[in-house]
A protein has these predicted regions:
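Short loop/turn segments immediately following beta-strands, especially the blade-tip
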Residues: 19-28, 65-74, 124-133, 173-180, ...
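Loop/turn-rich, solvent-exposed surfaces of beta-rich toroidal or solenoidal domains
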Residues: 254-327
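Blade-loop segments of beta-propeller domains
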Residues: 30-107, 300-302, 306-309
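Asp-box/WD-like beta-propeller blade repeats and closely related beta-sheet repeat scaffolds
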Residues: 73-154
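Short coil/turn segments that connect the beta-strands within blades of beta-propeller domains
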Residues: 2-4, 51-53, 105-108, 156-158, ...
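Surface-exposed loop and turn segments in beta-propeller and other repeat-based domains
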Residues: 80-91, 138-143, 188, 233-253, ...
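Conserved beta-strand position repeated across blades of beta-propeller domains
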Residues: 47, 101, 152, 200, ...
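Conserved beta-strand positions in repeat-built beta-propeller and related beta-rich domains
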Residues: 8-12, 57-60, 112-117, 162-165, ...
Length: 366
């Protein structure tokens, strides 16, 4: 079928889920539905369950779930509080639900991370028989100054890896049959200024890729088969052009911050993106060729994105081929579709959605 649908959320209220339609023959993108959701629960990161029958959202002070009947029929079913530190749910704290990872194997629990202050616990939620968020079954500790922004499972879904931006380390946990997790260990990031924000893993489970927000680089790790902890290979790749001015001369603050990384369906390529902290600068998108074992063979490109990316610039490869990659930004509210062909990346379609806080990450429905 030439028609594909993606869902996208917002950084700020009012809460809404936007469904866009991509025609891979006509090469067009259009908004087909704006689904209103609870006003104060905008979704800054969303993910589907293993069957794409439920959509889960990181929604300010809540974790939310929706039944997905079709691309345009999305029904709110649950809003659950952040677990762990009781101050996380206070209206007076800046703690925010930032990321969640639904398991693809039974019991299909959802693993969720708050961010900013009072974010020292990961939350595990069970789901109902239909997949709606049900109970907060575990709040497992990291450390008091933790701020996890991304997680990934190994291919067997036995080990869970977390990128701790504020504590500057990577964590490994073992998943138990109940869906709960237990600590394996942690490793510090290679540099004090790295701040790991995102992790992705090769389908072999041999290699882990850690995106460093402040370091603006992608670091390659091998997973130790005995301990299952990530071991840095001392191979890293730039996510902003080497030599570019990366500090504001007046304030000394960083001008760029790396965002997310994701593999293509085949596992042969990895995309990663970075955002700029000023609207008059551009963000960047990088592509990497991976060897069969999972090690990075070559960085293929480092292209500027149309805007800074704002809070977003999230790169989202489709899940049925290596051909299509969506990129969203919340500086101007664009959804853009890129074609990955012969190891070149080019834009084929875009649509602007001028809504508050649009657009966060895009997820592929079909």
């Amino acid at each position: 079928m030439p028609l594909h649908h993606l869902m996208i959320g917002t950084w700020t209220p009012p809460g809404a889920i936007f469904t866009v339609q991509f025609d891979d023959e006509k090469l067009t993108l259009e908004l087909v539905k704006r689904t209103e959701i609870p006003h104060d629960e905008p979704i800054s990161w969303m993910a589907f369950d293993h069957q794409k029958k439920n959509l889960y959202g990181s929604a300010m002070k809540k974790w939310t779930s929706f039944a997905v009947k079709s691309p345009t029929e999305i029904i709110h079913e649950a809003s659950l509080l952040i677990g762990g530190d009781p101050l996380a749910n206070s209206a007076d704290t800046n703690t925010r639900a930032i990321f969640l990872l639904p398991a693809k194997q039974a019991p299909y629990a959802v693993y969720a991370n708050p961010f900013y202050k009072h974010a020292g616990y990961g939350n595990v939620f069970s789901v109902s028989p239909t997949g709606a968020l049900d109970q907060n079954i575990q709040n497992y500790p990291y450390q008091p100054n933790t701020g996890i922004h991304g997680m990934v499972f190994d291919p067997t879904e036995t080990y869970l890896y977390s990128a701790d931006l504020t504590a500057n380390k990577l964590w490994a946990h073992r998943k138990l049959p109940s869906g709960e997790v237990e600590l394996v260990g942690s490793v510090d990031a290679p540099s004090p200024g790295d701040h790991p924000r995102w992790v992705a893993m090769h389908p072999t489970g041999n290699y882990l890729y850690a995106l460093m927000e402040a370091g603006n680089r992608l670091c390659e790790y091998v997973t130790d088969p005995a301990t299952h902890l990530p071991v840095y290979t001392h191979h890293s790749y730039p996510l902003i052009p080497p030599g570019i001015r990366d500090r504001d001369p007046e304030t000394g603050k960083g001008l760029y911050r790396a965002d997310v990384c994701a593999l293509t369906m085949s596992g042969n390529y990895l995309f990663a993106s970075a955002r700029a902290n000023k609207f008059d600068l551009t963000g960047y998108v990088a592509a990497f060729r991976l060897r069969e074992c999972g090690s990075i063979e070559k960085q293929l490109c480092l292209n500027p994105t149309p805007t800074s990316g704002g809070h977003s610039n999230a790169v989202a490869p489709c899940d049925w081929s290596d051909e299509w990659v969506a990129i969203t930004d919340d500086q101007e509210g664009w959804v853009e579709m890129y074609r990955w062909k012969d190891e070149f990346l080019h834009r084929v379609a875009r649509v602007q959605i001028p809504e508050p806080g649009f657009g966060m990450n895009a997820i592929w429905y079909d």
